[in-house]
């Protein structure tokens, strides 16, 4: 078990500990539960879905990287597939505050990058900030997405974001988590192809500036992130943050990164290179390449 989970795990009910122990035994537990695992945990612990999600929130929050605020937020995105995806906030010392990943963004991008097609609910241990409410409004679940908070009745995103502005106001039909493939040809080595594949998945209906990042760890493991734009622009999630989020959720550290590649168009309206390189260098990675999409 990764050390970050030990304190939260010790506070769980005994029957839930017994069911979770083999799942968490892997140091690189992927911070997600399959629909089958969720069903097993519900039956073993005698909990319904909502109660189980609340019980697991401390494990999600344990994934937080909060060197600046020391305020850990955990979230669980519940996919329409039945799979559950952990998320937690991330802060990057030496970079800028704008590079921060919020817990809801973390869980949602985690689900998206693992191929989830839509979300039924998000469970989070603190009320979503305005930034996250706007980020969630880009999803194909729209304002019907259910939000679950401890000690409160569940509400929809519509309740938390009244008079919402979103992609429909800009006549955008393809939403975040809808399947997208921009068709860029895969070239180069495995890591380069992974970055291009991530760029092909980009949600960028406002700037038409696709981009993807691939990070290779010293053990050969590769994590990718795709660009996810938002109708309100500022809640947009850059591709590097998506990749770093997956890397961290899987129990890796920034020091494990040995190489990074950004794939983007050289003539795009928005360019990720400077911000991507600056953030990676702040985290200790200097082996950074860029491939131009054709």
Curated annotation (Swiss-Prot):
Domain of life: Bacteria
EC number: 3.5.4.5
Residues holding Zn(2+): 102, 129, 132
GO MF, one annotated term: identical protein binding
CDD domains xref list: cytidine_deaminase
Enzyme's top EC category: hydrolase
Reactions that this protein is recorded to catalyse: cytidine + H2O + H(+) = uridine + NH4(+); 2'-deoxycytidine + H2O + H(+) = 2'-deoxyuridine + NH4(+)
Keyword set, alphabetical order: Hydrolase, Metal-binding, Zinc
Family: Belongs to the cytidine and deoxycytidylate deaminase family.
Subunit structure: Homodimer.
Name of the protein: Cytidine deaminase
Lineage: Bacteria, Pseudomonadati, Pseudomonadota, Gammaproteobacteria, Enterobacterales
The encoding gene: cdd
């Amino acid at each position: 078990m990764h050390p970050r989970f030990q304190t939260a795990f010790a506070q769980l009910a005994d029957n839930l500990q017994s069911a979770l122990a083999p799942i968490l035994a892997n140091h690189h537990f992927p911070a997600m539960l399959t629909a089958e695992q969720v069903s097993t945990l519900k039956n073993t612990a005698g909990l319904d879905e909502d109660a189980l999600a609340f019980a697991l929130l401390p494990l999600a929050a344990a994934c937080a990287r909060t060197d600046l605020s020391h305020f850990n937020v955990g979230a669980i995105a519940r996919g329409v597939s039945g799979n559950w995806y952990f998320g937690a906030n991330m802060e990057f010392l030496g970079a800028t505050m704008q590079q921060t990943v919020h817990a809801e963004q973390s869980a949602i991008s985690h689900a998206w990058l693992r191929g989830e097609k839509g979300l039924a609910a998000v469970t989070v241990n603190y009320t979503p900030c305005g930034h996250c409410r706007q980020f969630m409004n880009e999803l194909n679940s729209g304002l019907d997405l259910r939000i679950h908070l401890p000690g409160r009745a569940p509400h929809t995103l519509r309740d938390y974001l009244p008079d919402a502005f979103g992609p429909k106001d800009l006549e955008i039909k393809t939403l975040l988590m809808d399947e997208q493939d921009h068709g860029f040809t895969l070239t180069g080595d495995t890591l380069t192809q992974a970055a291009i594949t991530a760029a092909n998945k980009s949600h960028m209906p406002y700037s038409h500036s696709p981009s993807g990042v691939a990070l290779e760890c010293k053990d050969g493991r590769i994590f990718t992130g795709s660009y996810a734009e938002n109708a309100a622009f500022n809640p947009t999630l850059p591709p590097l943050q998506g990749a770093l989020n997956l890397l961290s959720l899987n129990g890796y550290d920034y020091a494990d990164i040995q190489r990074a590649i950004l794939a983007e168009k050289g003539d795009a309206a928005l360019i990720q290179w400077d911000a991507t390189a600056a953030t990676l260098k702040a985290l200790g990675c200097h082996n950074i390449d860029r491939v131009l999409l054709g």
